[in-house]
């Protein structure tokens, strides 16, 4: 068994095994334990009572967090005409059609979100092998294929997160940065869970939100006492 580093020992000494933490307490502890030289993301993992092997129990959506994620989001939009002007006015970093597709095929993929209007899907459809593996393929289920590209750009820039259950029925997403106030982090997590409950599959039985775990990029995961969340 590999020996624990000094940092790992220090972390282990401050975490109570088996404890479900009050959210504000957990946020404060994660901040205390963050010793890296960059601003770590604060991430949440939510274990859901679903069977992702069943297509009607795959949970997938997008929601705008009230306080954003603290990240600068680069957005590319496939559209044309007045919609292109609206997308640029909304803050899109790049707008185009065939020219943008050619750039992406050439390896220019420095974007966090790709949005498309329905009429642009004839162009975007050629990029499945380029965008798909990176999770960038526009999809109407998460609002990235829409005639209202300007609103989609604004949502992306405002801190919209997209999520989907993995093979174990868990969703993972960022909910802020270590420097965020604990109350803002809490409100972001509450907004996420409210959205998860809104789209609960009708066929899901028993406990739906089974476990909520908060962590940082390089830190430990702390189980959250759901009673400390207002949702």
Swiss-Prot record:
Gene Ontology CC: cytosolic large ribosomal subunit
PANTHER family in the cross-refs: 54S RIBOSOMAL PROTEIN L1, MITOCHONDRIAL, LARGE RIBOSOMAL SUBUNIT PROTEIN UL1M
HAMAP family: Ribosomal_uL1_B
Quaternary data: Part of the 50S ribosomal subunit.
Biological process annotations from GO: regulation of translation; translation
UniProt keyword annotations, A-Z: Repressor, Ribonucleoprotein, Ribosomal protein, RNA-binding, rRNA-binding, Translation regulation, tRNA-binding
Protein source organism: Pseudomonas fluorescens (strain ATCC BAA-477 / NRRL B-23932 / Pf-5)
Name of the protein in its database record: Large ribosomal subunit protein uL1
Matches recorded under NCBIfam families: rplA_bact (TIGR01169)
SUPFAM superfamilies: Ribosomal protein L1
Gene Ontology MF annotations: rRNA binding; structural constituent of ribosome; tRNA binding
Gene name as annotated: rplA
Keyword ATP-binding: no
Functional summary from the UniProt entry: Binds directly to 23S rRNA. The L1 stalk is quite mobile in the ribosome, and is involved in E site tRNA release. Protein L1 is also a translational repressor protein, it controls the translation of the L11 operon by binding to its mRNA.
Pfam families for this protein: Ribosomal_L1
Signal peptide residues on this chain, from the entry's feature table: none
Keyword rRNA-binding in record: yes
Disulfide bonds: none
């Amino acid at each position: 068994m590999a020996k624990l580093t000094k940092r790992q020992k220090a972390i282990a000494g401050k975490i109570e095994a088996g404890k479900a933490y009050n959210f504000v307490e957990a946020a404060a502890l994660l901040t205390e334990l963050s010793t890296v030289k960059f601003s770590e993301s604060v991430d949440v993992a939510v274990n859901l009572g679903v069977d992702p092997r069943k297509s009607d129990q795959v949970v997938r959506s997008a929601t705008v967090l009230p306080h954003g994620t603290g990240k600068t989001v680069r957005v590319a939009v496939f559209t044309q005409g007045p919609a292109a002007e609206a997308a640029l006015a909304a803050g899109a970093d790049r707008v185009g059609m065939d020219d943008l597709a050619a750039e992406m095929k050439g390896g220019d993929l420095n974007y966090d979100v790709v949005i498309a209007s329905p009429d642009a899907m004839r162009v975007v459809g050629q990029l499945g092998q380029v965008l798909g593996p990176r999770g960038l393929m526009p999809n109407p289920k998460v609002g990235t294929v829409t005639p209202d590209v300007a609103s989609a750009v604004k949502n992306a820039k405002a801190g919209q997160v997209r999520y989907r259950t993995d093979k174990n029925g868990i969703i993972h997403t960022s909910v802020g940065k270590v420097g965020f106030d604990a109350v803002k982090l809490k409100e972001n997590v509450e907004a996420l869970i409210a959205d998860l409950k809104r789209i609960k599959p009708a066929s899901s039985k028993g406990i739906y939100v089974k476990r909520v775990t908060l962590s940082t990029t390089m830190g430990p995961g702390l189980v959250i006492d759901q009673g400390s969340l207002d949702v």
